[in-house]
């Protein structure tokens, strides 16, 4: 078995203790200023000081050496919350929002998510596949090596299944590890505008069984927000999804403190996402339940809202993950580097905390930490080489990509 030895590199990585990094642990990185990484069959065999890794390499088979040129090495980014499967951008609504129209007002008038629903219904499956694959490849160029993609622009059984099929095709054809999430309860379609309860019943009785039969989605999500789906409606849907074997996620407390974070804690969801308006009480409940907070600072940036209180969450030992929320309405970016910069500059996270949030904790938010998210022995050799002395360059050097190279399972892919 041949080995690859990546040497002459400064390594920075969170280390996996078997659980998400919370509290002070989120800010701790392993650092090897004269580091090396030994890879076999796409998996990490050894990582650490170059001399120690060389000793391991000499005891094995033939070794191919790769000189990293003194560059900084970090884990590949894991993006645990995206809506990359969509048919058309929404630039006109961007102009409306800049002029002062609120996101929820646009939605109530049939725009927003409902505009994307109409576009997906009109799009052919191949067209949707090509545009989604392009966005995934763009994310890869910025250093993302694993990500999640949600459905949610279908809102009927046929189009939700179409979106999941597209996500499944992209997962096969892309080199990234891609996780699909079913988000049938993303908005209330027109025919159910006055009866959201009936729509939830339809999802539970018709959509969910078909989603389970299709076998592509690994999680179920719901937009739990005033004017969309209530706490009780969200509870009914998520409990049904859990009974069908799906992991749970919640769009929680993005606009108002409805209590979605508390519901995530009650149900033992894998993550609660957004959380701009989450209360101290529900943040503590998330901590006690081990729910990961997936924060989306690019959305707050785009909507010109206050940012989620990452510092409060970290101080309460909630593991914080970071994601792009890439979507055509409120966060059109594929760049985890941009997200890290916003987290450091606007959410008071340290560069080390942000890197952990964009890698290890994000992997836990997708139940993927057994194979990605850190440079631990036995995990996939998914890593980045940076143009900079430390990971702080990701926030410090704004407006450019600091990623020199992207490796997936030990192979250079960008």
UniProtKB/Swiss-Prot annotation:
The annotation note on the cofactor reads:
Binds 1 zinc or iron ion per subunit.
Q: What residue spans carry the Polar residues bias annotation?
A: 1-20
The entry lists its GO molecular-function terms as:
imidazolonepropionase activity; iron ion binding; zinc ion binding
Q: Which GO terms describe its biological process?
A: L-histidine catabolic process to glutamate and formamide; L-histidine catabolic process to glutamate and formate
Domain of life per record: Bacteria
For the region Disordered, what residue ranges are annotated? Answer: 1-26
Q: What is the species listed in this Swiss-Prot or TrEMBL entry?
A: Desulfotalea psychrophila (strain LSv54 / DSM 12343)
What protein does this entry describe? Imidazolonepropionase
First-listed, main subcellular location of the protein, grouped into a coarse class: cytoplasm
User: According to its UniProt record, what is one Pfam family this protein matches?
Assistant: Amidohydro_1
Q: Which cofactor does it need?
A: Zn(2+); Fe(3+)
């Amino acid at each position: 078995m041949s080995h690859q030895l990546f040497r002459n590199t400064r390594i920075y990585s969170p280390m996996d203790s078997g659980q998400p990094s919370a509290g002070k642990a989120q800010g701790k990185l392993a650092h090897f200023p004269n580091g090396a990484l030994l890879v076999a069959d796409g998996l990490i065999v050894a990582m650490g000081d170059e001399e120690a890794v060389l000793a391991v390499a000499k005891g094995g088979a033939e070794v191919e050496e790769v000189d990293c040129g003194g560059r900084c090495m970090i884990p590949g980014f894991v993006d645990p919350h995206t809506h990359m499967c969509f048919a058309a951008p929404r630039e006109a609504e961007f102009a409306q929002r800049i002029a002062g129209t609120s996101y929820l007002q646009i939605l109530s008038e049939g725009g927003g998510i409902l505009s994307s629903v109409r576009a997906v219904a009109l799009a052919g499956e191949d067209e949707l596949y090509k545009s989604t694959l392009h966005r995934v490849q763009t994310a890869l160029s910025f250093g993302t090596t694993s990500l999640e993609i949600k459905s949610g622009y279908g809102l009927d059984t046929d189009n939700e299944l179409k979106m999941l099929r597209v996500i499944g095709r992209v997962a096969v054809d892309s080199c990234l590890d891609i996780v699909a999430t079913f988000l049938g309860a993303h908005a209330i379609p027109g025919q159910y505008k006055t009866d959201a309860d009936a729509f939830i019943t339809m999802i539970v009785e018709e959509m969910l069984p078909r989603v389970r039969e299709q076998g592509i989605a690994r999680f179920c999500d719901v937009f739990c927000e005033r004017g969309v789906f209530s706490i009780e409606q969200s509870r009914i849907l998520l409990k049904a999804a859990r009974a069908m074997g799906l992991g749970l996620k919640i769009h929680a407390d993005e606009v108002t403190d409805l209590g979605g974070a508390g519901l995530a804690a009650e149900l033992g969801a894998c993550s609660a996402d957004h959380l701009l308006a989450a209360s101290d009480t529900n943040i503590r409940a998330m901590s006690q339940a081990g729910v990961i907070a997936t924060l989306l600072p690019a959305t707050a940036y785009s909507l010109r809202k206050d940012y989620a209180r990452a510092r409060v969450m970290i101080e309460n030992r909630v593991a914080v993950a970071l994601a792009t929320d890439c979507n055509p309405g409120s966060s059109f970016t594929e760049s985890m580097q941009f997200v890290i910069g916003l987290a450091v500059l606007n959410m008071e996270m340290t560069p080390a905390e942000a890197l952990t949030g964009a890698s290890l904790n994000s992997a836990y938010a997708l139940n993927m930490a057994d194979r990605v998210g850190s440079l631990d022995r036995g995990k996939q050799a998914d890593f980045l080489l940076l143009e900079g002395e430390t990971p702080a360059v990701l926030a410090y050097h704004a407006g450019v990509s600091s990623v020199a190279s992207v490796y997936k399972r030990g192979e250079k892919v960008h």
